[in-house]
């Protein structure tokens, strides 16, 4: 029979189908299995309106037959089959979909969920096959026909022998090249894995005659090979089962089987939404942190299914970065896929699903916080930093979403507390939410700057994570209460500020002299009423704090960003009498004391001093 040319487009179009639309060769099997499932669906829907067509679900299946000797891979279905006209129209015309036409014809009926809608998935098989043979026996025909093609050269159609209804696709697998190993598509183990990966939830059994080994009868140590049909897919997704049928252990097993994590999840969340866009989500909050979570190598995203067929392993658009720790999947019939079924069109359906998922995750986290505090603390120790990054990123666009989820260590409660809990305990005369940043809890406890706030009986939040202060500066306030660092020049204590101003006026010349000695290292030297037992400390003179300076200094291209500092002197400390005496009688000694006290303040903050040798010499002079 003469070779026919493809009706639509040209050699270039077919090349595009094979080489450009699909980015992953292995998805050809997903496409052919989805087509086979569609064919069985069509037979079922026809049986609903045609009493001459029988349909017993247990008799319908998809069979996979690899043959290494002949280098063929065969996919057989027991579906509706194709007539000669349908072979011509559906396979002879690129991008013509029989499934789409059938769906349009039946769209008034409920329950139609045909997967294939574009008519190009079939051609993905040319990525791994030199030749494709399709034998099909239509339910509407007494004769069977064969469609055969080697790709761009065109195709042939002729009658053939095939008694059973349905379609048989025979792929002649390409020979290996230096760059490509096509043998893998003939290996039973690999085929089984591909079906588990992409087509595990096709609702009809996918069978393959598998080679197995058993103990030879009558022997103790001799084994023999045998072949047995094995169903490779589980068919019914766990998220489509009745909730009453699924136990917590089932979700936990699914979580581990899918390699979402190696331990039981902290929380399993199942959500079914119907409306403008309908979908089912099965989400998991991990109980442990992935080893690469806080690295660039970590890839966020949920598995995305269309009618139970995996179309994307990591759909990043479904999760905001601050919830990137969430694992799981989404299955929807309403997705607008592009013609390769590999990629999504970025439309409002996807955005709406993502918005709903974000709200669901927040709701579940708040529920855990309220009802299972210990579980939330465990979660927060693993992923709290990510939530705080979320507050800081995008110029604070998500701060209102996350502000009730973040926690900090409390000076009075000696544990992690929420901002809401802090505000609920604020004293009547307290204006601000006070916080103290530092390297760790133990060091923050000893900071001189916290003394006056403690004496007032005010609770202090400890910021021991590098992102904490950046997040709070973006948050700015909570329930109309501003945040105030214990390093701030103004702590909001009016009585102490008046006394402080008096001390500054009385000792103005001393402080100006010390500032000049330090030669630009500080913006100001002044009296301090925040100090009780310590002689000296540093305070912030600008929005860039001392702790932020440390963080920024470790970043690439930091441009040597420095915090503007204030050196504060405790005028009630004995050291200040020595300072005043030196100012009056020994200016050289005061120069040494100024440098010494400044370096002491730097060491308290964990900042490097410029000249350690000179500092050591000054200490020795003071001892003498």
Curated annotation (Swiss-Prot):
Swiss-Prot/TrEMBL keywords: ATP-binding, Chaperone, Cytoplasm, Nucleotide-binding, Stress response
InterPro entries per UniProt: HATPase_C_sf, Heat_shock_protein_90_CS, HSP90_C, Hsp90_fam, Hsp90_N, Ribosomal_Su5_D2-typ_SF
Subcellular location as annotated: Cytoplasm
Segments for region (A): 1-341
Coiled coil spans: none
Region (C): 551-624
Classification via Pfam families: HATPase_c_3 (PF13589), HSP90 (PF00183)
GO molecular function, one term: ATP binding
Region (B): 342-550
HAMAP family according to UniProt: HSP90
Assembly and interaction partners: Homodimer.
Family: Belongs to the heat shock protein 90 family.
PANTHER family linked to this entry: HEAT SHOCK PROTEIN 90 FAMILY MEMBER
Protein name per Swiss-Prot or TrEMBL: Chaperone protein HtpG
Native source species: Clostridium tetani (strain Massachusetts / E88)
């Amino acid at each position: 029979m003469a070779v026919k040319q493809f009706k639509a487009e040209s050699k270039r179009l077919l090349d595009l189908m094979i080489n450009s639309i699909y980015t992953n060769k292995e998805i050809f099997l997903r496409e052919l299995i989805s087509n086979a499932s569609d064919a069985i669906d069509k037979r079922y829907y026809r049986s609903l309106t045609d009493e001459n067509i029988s349909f017993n679900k247990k008799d319908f299946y998809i069979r996979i037959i690899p043959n290494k000797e002949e280098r063929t891979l065969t996919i057989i279905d027991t579906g509706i089959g194709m007539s000669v006209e349908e072979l011509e129209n559906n396979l002879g015309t690129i991008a013509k979909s029989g499934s789409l036409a059938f769906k349009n014809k039946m769209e008034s009926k409920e329950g139609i969920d045909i997967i294939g809608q574009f008519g190009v998935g079939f051609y993905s098989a040319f990525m791994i096959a030199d030749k494709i043979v399709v034998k099909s026996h239509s339910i509407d025909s007494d004769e069977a026909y064969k469609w055969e093609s080697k790709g761009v050269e065109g195709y042939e159609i002729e009658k053939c022998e095939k008694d059973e209804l349905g379609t048989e696709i025979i792929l002649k697998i390409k020979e290996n090249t230096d760059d490509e190993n096509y043998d893998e598509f003939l290996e039973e183990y690999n085929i089984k894995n591909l079906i588990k990966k992409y087509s595990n939830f096709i609702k009809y059994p996918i069978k393959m005659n598998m080679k197995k080994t058993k103990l030879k009868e009558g022997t103790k140590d001799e084994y023999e090979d045998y072949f047995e049909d094995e169903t490779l897919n589980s068919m019914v997704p766990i998220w489509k089962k009745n909730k009453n049928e699924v136990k917590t252990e089932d979700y936990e097993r699914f979580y581990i089987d899918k390699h979402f994590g190696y331990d039981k999840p902290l929380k399993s969340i199942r959500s079914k939404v119907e409306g403008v866009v309908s979908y089912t989500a099965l989400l998991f909050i991990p109980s442990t942190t992935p080893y690469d979570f806080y690295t660039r190598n970590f890839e966020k995203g949920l598995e995305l299914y269309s009618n139970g067929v995996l179309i994307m392993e990591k759909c990043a658009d479904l999760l905001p970065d601050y919830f990137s720790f969430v694992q799981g999947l989404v299955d929807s019939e309403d997705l607008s896929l592009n013609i390769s079924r590999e990629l999504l069109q970025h439309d409002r359906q996807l955005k709406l699903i993502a918005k709903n998922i974000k709200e669901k995750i927040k709701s579940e986290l708040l529920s855990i916080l309220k009802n299972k505090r210990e579980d939330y603390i465990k979660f927060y120790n693993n992923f709290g930093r990510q939530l705080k990054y979320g507050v800081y990123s995008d110029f604070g666009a998500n701060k209102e979403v996350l502000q009730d989820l973040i926690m900090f260590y409390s000076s009075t409660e000696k544990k992690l507390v929420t901002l809401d809990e802090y505000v609920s305990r604020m004293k009547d005369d307290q204006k601000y939410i006070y916080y103290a940043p530092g390297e760790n809890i133990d060091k923050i406890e000893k900071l001189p700057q916290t003394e006056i706030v403690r004496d007032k009986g005010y609770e202090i939040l400890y910021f021991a994570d590098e992102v904490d202060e950046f997040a709070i500066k973006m948050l700015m306030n909570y329930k109309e209460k501003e945040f105030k660092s214990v390093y701030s020049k103004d702590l909001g204590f009016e009585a102490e500020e008046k006394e402080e101003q008096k001390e500054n006026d009385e000792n103005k010349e001393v402080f100006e002299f010390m500032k000049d000695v330090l030669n630009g290292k500080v913006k100001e030297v002044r009296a301090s009423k925040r100090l009780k037992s310590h002689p000296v400390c540093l305070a912030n003179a600008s929005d860039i704090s001392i702790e932020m300076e440390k963080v920024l200094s470790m970043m690439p291209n930091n441009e040597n960003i420095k915090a503007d500092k204030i050196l504060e002197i405790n005028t009630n400390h004995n050291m200040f009498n020595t300072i005043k005496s030196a100012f009056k009688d020994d200016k050289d000694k005061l120069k040494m004391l100024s440098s010494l006290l400044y370096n002491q303040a730097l060491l308290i903050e964990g900042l490097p001093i410029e000249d350690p040798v000179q500092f050591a010499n000054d200490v020795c002079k003071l001892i003498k």
